[in-house]
């Protein structure tokens, strides 16, 4: 993904890379994830798999540009090979009703770190501010991946949500309250049931839970 800073360039291709010190402290793989995805999609092609389920955490941390980049990769694979994808959001793909800022450190071509943030309040020499780093909330965070199950598609034989047949976000809302009852938020449930071809049913349950804090 391109976050708008001078990163590492190899053979004319820009690479967004995290440091080893950050990678080793995480349970996730940062720098190898793109190659792993392309390798998995190539195996999908070779095996003739027609339907692929993405069970959450399909982005790094839901950054706008990361989600858009993934969308492009899946669209190209779908259009070229006819593979259908069905997504569910993980806790790293979307956050609550309004989203949240992210700040990450990346490597520059000289091996030094640069902070990239969506939070305009972050100041300091060398800090790159960009809204590409922002993680969207419901339903905006679903829109880029909307064609991958979240919303009804013309070729589906059947599609519905726990709230009925409408795929409109305003028809898929529910209230959540803080334990003291003082804070109430309206959230969208991204769950859906789809029959993409006769006899194949996929029950996709949005397991994200966002609990308002007291006060």
Label every PLM stretch briefly.
Residues 69-215:
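Extended active-site neighborhood of metal-dependent phosphoesterases/phosphodiesterases
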Residues 1-67:
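N-terminal active-site segment of His-dependent metallophosphoesterases
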């Amino acid at each position: 993904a391109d976050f708008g800073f001078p990163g590492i360039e190899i053979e004319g291709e820009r690479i967004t890379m995290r440091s080893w010190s950050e990678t080793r402290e995480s349970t996730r793989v940062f720098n190898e994830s793109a190659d792993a995805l392309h390798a998995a999609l190539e195996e999908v092609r070779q095996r003739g798999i027609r339907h692929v389920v993405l069970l959450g955490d399909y982005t790094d941390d839901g950054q706008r540009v990361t989600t858009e980049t993934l969308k492009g990769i899946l669209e190209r694979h779908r259009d070229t090979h006819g593979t259908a994808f069905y997504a569910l959001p993980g806790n790293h793909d979307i956050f609550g009703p309004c989203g949240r800022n992210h700040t990450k450190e990346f490597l520059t071509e000289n091996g030094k770190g640069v902070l990239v943030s969506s939070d305009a309040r972050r100041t300091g020499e060398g800090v790159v501010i960009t809204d590409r780093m922002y993680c969207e909330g419901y339903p905006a965070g679903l829109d880029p991946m909307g064609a991958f199950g979240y919303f009804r598609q013309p070729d589906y034989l059947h599609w519905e949500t726990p709230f009925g047949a409408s795929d409109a976000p305003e028809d898929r809302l529910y209230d959540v309250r803080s334990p003291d009852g003082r804070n109430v938020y309206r959230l969208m449930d991204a769950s859906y049931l789809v029959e993409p071809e006769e006899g194949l049913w996929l029950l996709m349950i949005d397991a994200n839970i966002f609990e308002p804090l007291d006060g």
